[in-house]
C-alpha cells in the first residue's frame, strides 16, 4: 500500500509536522529524507530494509557504496543523499564550537570528532586550535598514516598553533581497529606534544582517541597529567 493511503497519523511527513521530528522512529526519519521508495516498496519499507540490513544509523551512514547500493530501491542518487547527512551534522557541530560559548559542551566536541574520524579506514590525526575563550579557530588534519600507525611531528603541531595564534589545542586521532584504548606510542607522543606546546605557551587541553562509536579522553582518564 502506498504511503498516501495510510492514515494521516501514520505518515512520517504528516507525523513530523504534527508531533515534531523526535516523535519519529529512525526508519520514519529516513523515509522522510528518502522521499520515495521503489516499485512495490514504500519509502518507509525501504528505510526499514536499510535499518534491518545495517542495524544502526551509524553503520548505515558509514557503509561503503557497494553495501548500500545492494539494497533494492537504493540508487546512486539516494546514496549521495545519505552521504550528505553526517557531513551536515559535522558542520553544524563545528559551527557550535565557534560560538561565543566555545567548548562548554564536551559532548559536542566528542560528537564532532566522532563524525570526523570514525568513518575513516586510515589513522588520521587532527587538531582543533582554540582562542583564549576556548572558541575553535580552525580544525585541521595534519597527519595521515597506515591502518595502525601515524607519524606525528610535535613541531608541526606547534607551528600550526603559532600560525593560528592559538591559546590552546585539542588533538585527536582514530583507531580503525575499533579499540579506543591508547597505545604506549599514543602516550609517548602525547608527552612529546605537550612539552613542545608548553615551550610556546600553548596548552594541550585534551587528546581523544576515536574508535567507532567510542571516544577515549586522555584528560578524563588523568593521562594528560602524566604527559607533561
UniProtKB/Swiss-Prot annotation:
One of its GO terms (biological process) is proteolysis. CDD domains: MPN_DUF2466. The keyword Metal-binding applies. GO terms for molecular function: metal ion binding; metallopeptidase activity. A motif (JAMM motif) lies at residues 173-186. InterPro entries: MPN (IPR037518), RadC_JAB (IPR025657), RuvA_2-like (IPR010994), UPF0758 (IPR001405), UPF0758_CS (IPR020891), UPF0758_N (IPR046778). It comes from the Bacteria. Residues 102-224 form the MPN domain. Zn(2+) binds at residues 173, 175, 186. Keywords: Hydrolase, Metal-binding, Metalloprotease, Protease, Zinc. Belongs to the UPF0758 family. This is UPF0758 protein Reut_A2732. It comes from Cupriavidus pinatubonensis (strain JMP 134 / LMG 1197).
